[in-house]
């Protein structure tokens, strides 16, 4: 298991990230999660605990929620498992074997229920089936005319490994279904090993001098994924059946009835499965199962809740890698008590000041922990955390362990409340907490050493200077070795071409190509230059708005210097620019309030030719008539609920908003459409009837 104190894990809360940092963090998370998936699903050798893995996925999901424009094509949210091993033949699942989203408490489960109700427009939550979440290996079994013909692991969710010969050796897998069954059906289940069988297997392995398994899940996965089926036959594997894939004919109208059919066909279904009538019953069931967890003969890590009505499951469908009609209520991680020795301030690459607790080393859930995130100064004040306190630590819900509470009776005399820093501990610039925000930020921007690398990477990115051959890796190397310490140094690199050519991995041709690429970017449109500065909240769209409003770099600089004066005409004008507003205006004023930012800005601008703003927006070829459009729904739709319509529109690339503005492209009007339809008419925005919407969206 890896140590969560590894510096590769960011301590910066998602809400404190800039768009550039969010993209970089999502790329790191995608790479790390893929690595962990390979280790878990393909190699049967997990590198981190389940709680740490869930926390990584939670962090990824939260960053994607806050920064939808930064979502990667290979997002872990759209991926399950890992590619099948080349040692096995591949079998494609007719119905993908997707994963489940997680909840960790009653509040999150209530929100899961509320989302389903809103999507389906139901007055109350539907009935659920609850099943203990077995910690094993998912399997798909194909039966044709009642006879087992194929068995495949989950793999990457779309394609799994052919383990048919091995599965035939499992006692819990019927070779022929008992009674009547569809001509073709896929049955899903979980292969696992009991705790007693696991201990017995490891004793045998040790006696024979063979591999010792880390836990029952690893033992089950390793036993099933044997190239020699006779090895699998001698391993004590079991299976609980729990779901259906493709079927040539309907089997049941409810999931509960389907479980009954599985038992009729000869499968073992977890006897603890239960019908659940409401959210209170779900919470009670989870509490009861968690309390008896240690007494069960097999490992579980939570409870799975599925909406019982299969017709509702079909209506709800899927989002990303998970169904909307099911969730896994994961059990909480372990807690431990330790002493908070010091509160340190970490400055993130976007200037966010994040407090970090340095702890006396303590073992939590099998991992030695020495640090924990404190998130922000409000969180410290809310929990009244002080240096010297004895604290309760928990490793659930975040990549870095969290302090849950303080043991007040053990507080030492003289322990002082935390006092927020007013200046950056790295560069000394003013640290400002904008109104309405929880994060304090360094205003050093272009000059703070903690931020400079991220700023430089952002500066050379495609929407900014777009310097070919100068990416993140080169920036990191050049900064490490002293070739680049600030933005203007980028344009001094051609003068050091010979030095770069002598570097490992470069050579004369590469160095010359880099010099030419840099020289080609000495002329840049004003809007791209603005974006390249990396000022918080100044993305591509806002950079265009500002560039078009001020017209030139010189005019913008003059106006911004004047806008530093509270109440000045220039400051009022800045906040009144359409699409900018007071929050973004404050970011610009804060940037120009730091003299070193102005010096760095002038130094960079002096090396460039900053031309007029670029023309219209660039966009990819449209895959559908809705791609890139802004849509508002109003009134009652007949063919689908509002959430279903929104999901349809978003799946085709549209953005759905709740209010009509000049930016709105279409307003879809259902029955009893109200003020939104009227406003659309006033603004001259095209309205669509439900029939026209369905035609545009590809039918009902």
Curated annotation (Swiss-Prot):
Name of the protein in its database record: DNA ligase
Keywords, in A-Z order: DNA damage, DNA repair, DNA replication, Ligase, Magnesium, Manganese, Metal-binding, NAD, Zinc
Positions of region (Disordered): 1-22
Residues given in the record as NAD(+) binding sites: 50-54, 99-100, 131, 154, 190, 306, 330
Active-site feature positions: 133 (n6-amp-lysine intermediate)
Pfam families in UniProt: BRCT, DNA_ligase_aden, DNA_ligase_OB, DNA_ligase_ZBD, HHH_2
UniProt feature, compositional bias: Polar residues: 1-11
Annotated residues for binding of Zn(2+): 424, 427, 442, 448
HAMAP family (alphabetical): DNA_ligase_A (MF_01588)
Names of required cofactors: Mg(2+); Mn(2+)
Signal peptide bounds: none
Entry-linked SMART domains: BRCT, LIGANc
Every BRCT domain range: 621-700
One GO MF term: metal ion binding
GO cellular component: cytosol
GO-annotated biological processes: DNA repair; DNA replication
Keyword S-adenosyl-L-methionine: no
Protein family: Belongs to the NAD-dependent DNA ligase family. LigA subfamily.
Annotated function: DNA ligase that catalyzes the formation of phosphodiester linkages between 5'-phosphoryl and 3'-hydroxyl groups in double-stranded DNA using NAD as a coenzyme and as the energy source for the reaction. It is essential for DNA replication and repair of damaged DNA.
Keyword NAD on entry: yes
Catalytic reaction list: NAD(+) + (deoxyribonucleotide)n-3'-hydroxyl + 5'-phospho-(deoxyribonucleotide)m = (deoxyribonucleotide)n+m + AMP + beta-nicotinamide D-nucleotide
Superkingdom assignment: Bacteria
InterPro entries listed in its UniProt record: BRCT_dom (IPR001357), BRCT_dom_sf (IPR036420), DisA/LigA_HHH (IPR041663), DNA_ligase (IPR001679), DNA_ligase_AS (IPR018239), DNAligase_adenylation (IPR013839), DNAligase_N (IPR013840), NA-bd_OB-fold (IPR012340)
EC number annotated for this UniProt entry: 6.5.1.2
């Amino acid at each position: 298991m890896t140590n969560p104190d590894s510096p590769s894990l960011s301590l910066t809360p998602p809400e404190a990230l800039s768009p550039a940092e969010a993209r970089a963090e999502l790329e790191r998370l995608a790479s790390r999660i893929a690595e962990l998936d390979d280790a878990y699903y393909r190699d049967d050798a997990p590198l981190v605990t389940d709680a740490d893995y869930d926390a990584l996925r939670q962090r990824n999901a939260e960053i994607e929620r806050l920064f939808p424009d930064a979502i990667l094509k290979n997002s872990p949210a759209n991926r399950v498992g890992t590619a099948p091993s080349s040692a096995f033949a591949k079998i494609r699942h007719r119905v993908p074997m997707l994963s489940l989203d997680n909840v960790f408490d009653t509040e999150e489960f209530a929100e899961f229920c509320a989302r389903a109700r809103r999507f389906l427009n139901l007055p109350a939550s539907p009935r659920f089936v609850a099943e203990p979440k077995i910690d094993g290996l998912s399997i798909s079994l194909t039966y044709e005319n009642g006879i087992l013909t194929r068995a495949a692991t989950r793999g990457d969710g779309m394609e799994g490994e052919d383990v048919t010969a091995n599965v035939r050796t499992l006692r819990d897998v019927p070779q022929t279904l008992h009674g009547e069954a569809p001509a073709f059906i896929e049955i899903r289940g979980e292969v696992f090993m009991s705790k007693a069988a696991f201990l017995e297997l490891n004793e045998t392995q040790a006696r024979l001098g063979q591999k010792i398994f880390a836990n029952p899940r690893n033992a089950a996965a390793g036993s099933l994924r044997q190239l020699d089926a006779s090895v699998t036959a001698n391993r004590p594997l079991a299976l609980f059946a729990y779901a259906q894939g493709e079927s040539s004919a309907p089997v049941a109208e409810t999931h509960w009835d389907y479980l009954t059919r599985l038992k009729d066909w000869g499968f073992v279904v977890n006897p603890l499965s239960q019908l659940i009538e409401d959210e209170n019953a779900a919470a009670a069931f989870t509490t009861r199962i968690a309390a008896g967890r240690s007494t069960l003969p097999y490992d579980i890590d939570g409870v799975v809740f599925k909406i019982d009505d299969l017709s509702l499951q079909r209506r709800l469908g899927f989002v990303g890698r998970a169904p909307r009609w099911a969730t896994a209520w994961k059990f909480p991680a372990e807690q431990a008590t330790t002493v908070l020795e010091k509160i340190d301030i970490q400055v993130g690459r976007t200037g966010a000041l994040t407090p970090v607790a340095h702890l006396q080393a303590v073992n939590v859930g099998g991992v030695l922990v020495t640090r924990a995130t404190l998130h922000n100064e409000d969180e410290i004040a809310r929990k009244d955390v002080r240096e010297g306190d004895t604290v309760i630590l928990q490793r659930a819900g975040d990549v870095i362990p969290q302090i849950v509470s303080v043991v007040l009776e053990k507080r030492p005399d003289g322990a002082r409340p935390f006092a927020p820093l007013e200046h950056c501990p790295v560069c000394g610039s003013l640290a400002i907490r904008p109104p309405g925000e929880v994060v304090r930020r360094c205003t050093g921007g272009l000059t703070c050493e903690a931020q400079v690398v991220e700023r430089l990477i952002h500066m050379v990115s495609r929407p900014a200077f777009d310097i070919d051959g100068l990416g993140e890796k080169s920036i990191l190397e050049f900064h490490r070795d002293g070739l680049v310490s600030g933005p203007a140094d980028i344009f001094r690199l051609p003068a050091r071409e010979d030095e770069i050519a002598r570097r490992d991995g470069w050579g004369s041709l590469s160095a010359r190509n880099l010099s030419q690429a840099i020289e080609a970017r000495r002329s840049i449109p004003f809007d791209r230059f603005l974006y390249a500065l990396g000022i918080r909240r100044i993305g591509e769209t806002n950079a265009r708005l500002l560039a078009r409003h001020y017209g030139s770099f010189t005019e913008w600089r003059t106006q911004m210097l004047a806008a530093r004066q509270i109440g000045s005409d220039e400051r009022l004008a800045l906040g009144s620019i359409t699409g900018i507003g007071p929050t973004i205006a404050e970011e610009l004023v804060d940037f120009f309030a730091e003299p070193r930012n102005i010096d760095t800005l002038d130094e960079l601008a002096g090396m460039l030719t900053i031309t007029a703003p670029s023309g219209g927006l660039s966009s990819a070829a449209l895959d559908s008539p809705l791609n890139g459009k802004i849509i508002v729904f109003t009134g009652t739709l007949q063919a689908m609920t509002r959430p279903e319509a929104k999901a349809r529109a978003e799946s085709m690339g549209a953005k759905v908003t709740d209010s009509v503005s000049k930016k709105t492209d279409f307003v879809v009007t259902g029955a009893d459409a109200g003020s939104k339809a009227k406003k659309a008419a006033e603004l001259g925005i095209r309205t669509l009837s439900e029939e026209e919407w369905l035609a545009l969206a590809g039918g009902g």
